[in-house]
């Protein structure tokens, strides 16, 4: 009778500190936004949650690796919107791939950092992916909103508005800054909202 034994090695894979800068800082987690009609609303970002996602590796039915991959999550709401308006997750998978996933008003922007692969998907909610939406992503050194210059900004823009649901809450454009989160966005292709 043969007995297989193994020494299971546990590896921890953490999100790089530079990626953590995309989360909204605690002291900036409550802010106001306003549109071109001077309608203002409060934006509240909840505390950041951190957990370790378990994963395993096997060789000939014997467990050899026990990986724990760090996942960081943050979500938020605005005053006049029913449901979650904002949700950001960043996960380090096995130390080889960092995934940036941003749910914003019904659209999921996903970026594989190491490979530079980007996708945009229409969502029913933050867990339910729908059809792919034509979209661009560019990284800006800075972007000015209401006289304030924000640095390290992601700029998402939907390039085919006809491909998106007709719901007026869908974002057609989003500027998202490190440490601050959403600083400017356009909903339904008509209402432009800026951080105050």
What are these regions (language model features)?
Residues 3-6:
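C-terminal motif of bacterial Sec signal peptides marking the signal peptidase cleavage site
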Residues 8-196:
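Conserved functional acidic sites
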